[in-house]
């Protein structure tokens, strides 16, 4: 099997993601792809309709039982189904599942965030079976902890955990910004582990970008591995993220100074 690519998308509407889905479909015809998706904005919208406030700590959603039920319904029932249908309309044999299905994701609870967990492991055989069959797994970020309780998982963390578990050397995190910026606001084309940690400590990287960067760093355990943060709304976003070094920000384990800012 060719080199596996793990791609994380946000949870915006299919209309907003039609271009990137076409990119995913094109790449999936050439190499195995695992698609992981979020749904934060749409979860917040549904919670607002129900009069439930959203609370975040360190860029991560604090999740109680009511919020979890909404998150699970939106992630698995709405967003996942839309993405699978969208890919199948493009001729891709996509299969939808969550980290709960088959015990795909092994989760470790983050107590201070409520019903939230990080990824501690992966049942690789499940994804391997789907990929070997020529299908594209579309994964919703839900998982059960050691007590069997279903938890919300940050989608970036889920994607990184899957990348590590599969030994994938490329992880693409699609977001709504064009990359990581330095203290002067310049977009960085490359970023090393040390540089990323420094920018976090200095408060330059803040809010929801922090867990995204942390997830990217956790995926760099393989030689030659890279995580790419790119604007999923840009034209040909995935194709450019994979082929154009100036598109987005590439994060590597290299210790040398970065190429610089754009």
Residue ranges and their predicted role:
Residues 1-262:
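C-terminal catalytic "cap/lid" subdomain
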């Amino acid at each position: 099997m060719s080199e596996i690519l793990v791609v994380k998308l946000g949870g915006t509407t299919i209309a907003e993601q039609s271009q990137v889905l076409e990119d995913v479909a094109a790449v999936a015809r050439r190499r195995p792809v695992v698609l992981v998706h979020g749904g934060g904005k749409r979860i917040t919208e549904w919670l607002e309709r129900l009069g439930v406030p959203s609370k975040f700590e360190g860029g991560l959603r604090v999740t109680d039982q009511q919020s979890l039920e909404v998150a699970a319904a939106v992630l698995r029932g709405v967003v996942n189904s839309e993405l699978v249908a969208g890919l199948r309309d493009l001729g891709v044999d996509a299969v939808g599942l969550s980290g709960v299905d088959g015990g795909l994701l092994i989760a470790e609870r983050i107590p201070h965030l409520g019903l939230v967990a990080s990824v501690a492991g992966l049942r690789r055989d499940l994804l391997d079976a789907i990929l070997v069959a020529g299908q594209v797994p579309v994964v919703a970020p839900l998982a059960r902890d050691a007590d069997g309780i279903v938890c919300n998982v940050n989608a970036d963390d889920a994607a990184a955990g899957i990348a590590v578990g599969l030994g994938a050397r490329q992880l693409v995190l699609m977001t709504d910004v064009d990359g990581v910026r330095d203290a002067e606001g310049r977009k960085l084309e490359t970023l090393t582990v040390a540089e990323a940690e420094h920018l976090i400590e200095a408060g330059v990287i803040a809010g929801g970008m922090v867990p995204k960067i942390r997830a990217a760093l956790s995926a760099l355990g393989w030689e030659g591995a890279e995580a790419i943060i790119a604007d999923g709304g840009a034209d040909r976003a995935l194709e450019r993220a994979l082929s154009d070094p100036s598109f987005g920000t590439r994060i590597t384990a290299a210790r040398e100074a970065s190429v610089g800012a754009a």
